[in-house]
């Protein structure tokens, strides 16, 4: 359990220093946070334990949040981490800079039909994703739809919604009255998904009209309007949109549109990106994915047999089964999203810029990685050799490239934080070339010679990074820019997924405790020139010790 600390007069929780308040919700504040090591900005939602206890959800909230951390959808705010203190939960979430859809509509008025449809398609895709994984929002509103820098929608605040079970009715009345369905404000029983559909209808109306379909300062009058389901449809809305709105804002939940109905509506289907509702015909629910099972074991600290028992039980609400299907679905939707943007010329500033295609400063694509976007999409999927017309064609199967290093799908700043922790543990000395490139040395206690190597983090593909190990010989001088071309690479052990946390006392001092004051080239670092064979063995021993430390 973490403790709150003070950092330069500001509150620090874990590695995050809290800053200004972004908003205030039912259960507490949302503040901007900055990672102390990387400077990465996050949104930190502070949930007061006492307020949560009053709702009688403390017992299940941790388990629910564990699954919410697995949610990966391009239009849902990501939950990275949950930090607990005796008084609060701190939910560390993705930060987007565009603000709320509510503020955007207030400032600019109604949105053009094409843009409104694009945003609504993104919102419905996110809601469908959550419903398929047994989670309902129950408080959808423009204030909970955030916009990124490229005007893409991202839904926030799925954190406190109940896990939805078949046949289970939700009695809790929550949400804002203007967006709440008639059955919610009337205190009647409701199952869950249908109240989100109503709220989506209100959001669509707000996008197209710049106002709310049901609004009144007098709450009893507002409730009467909602129960009656009568709202004004402006003349500029075409008949197709009007029929969709009336179907979504149907008072009787049994007659209300479902997500399937909306997806089949002619207006909704126009210009619908394929990645929003991916279908993978190769996916067979009867085949168990071993990699997904292992990931569930890692996330929940359970055994493979426990996961298999959950899958064979046939209970779709089982937490391990939900997590397994989340992982499968995440892989499918991200693969299709990537293919969609590779197969067509992407719009300027697409969400892929924020997702897979964004390369932080100092982080380079791997030299042997195909460029992510090439003008002609069919060629973009060709092997590298097919693009090299000077290289003779071979009928033999091309061997996979091997690298001495570690591949990971963790965030680049998390990978580097783990590297700093391991190097400090091993008493390595290092110099920072840039945020993702280090020059490292270790003294051989027997010979007294220094062994040197370069650590460079590369972007390998849309989801993977390679921490490349390169030997630095006394005769090799790297460029001042810090760029290093990988030498002929050796085999890597396997996939390593760094832990999400780093010891704070270690991480806070990494930039000072291990840094070198001098250059890592020339005779400054070595009192004697090592023999080539000895240097190579020392280099491999250095690599092995670092890999072992990272695996702990």
Swiss-Prot record:
Activated by phosphorylation on Thr-172. Binding of AMP to non-catalytic gamma subunit (PRKAG1, PRKAG2 or PRKAG3) results in allosteric activation, inducing phosphorylation on Thr-172. AMP-binding to gamma subunit also sustains activity by preventing dephosphorylation of Thr-172. ADP also stimulates Thr-172 phosphorylation, without stimulating already phosphorylated AMPK. ATP promotes dephosphorylation of Thr-172, rendering the enzyme inactive. Under physiological conditions AMPK mainly exists in its inactive form in complex with ATP, which is much more abundant than AMP. The modification Phosphothreonine is found at residues 172, 258. Residues 16-268 form the Protein kinase domain. Skeletal muscle, lower levels in liver, heart and kidney. Residues 291-376 are annotated as: AIS. It is found in: Cytoplasm; Nucleus. ATP binds at residues 22-30, 45. GO terms for cellular component: apical plasma membrane; axon; cytoplasm; cytoplasmic stress granule; dendrite; neuronal cell body; nucleoplasm; nucleotide-activated protein kinase complex. It is an enzyme of class 2 (transferase). Residues 480-490, 501-510 have a biased composition (Polar residues). Belongs to the protein kinase superfamily. CAMK Ser/Thr protein kinase family. SNF1 subfamily. Catalytic subunit of AMP-activated protein kinase (AMPK), an energy sensor protein kinase that plays a key role in regulating cellular energy metabolism. In response to reduction of intracellular ATP levels, AMPK activates energy-producing pathways and inhibits energy-consuming processes: inhibits protein, carbohydrate and lipid biosynthesis, as well as cell growth and proliferation. AMPK acts via direct phosphorylation of metabolic enzymes, and by longer-term effects via phosphorylation of transcription regulators. This is 5'-AMP-activated protein kinase catalytic subunit alpha-2. The gene is Prkaa2.
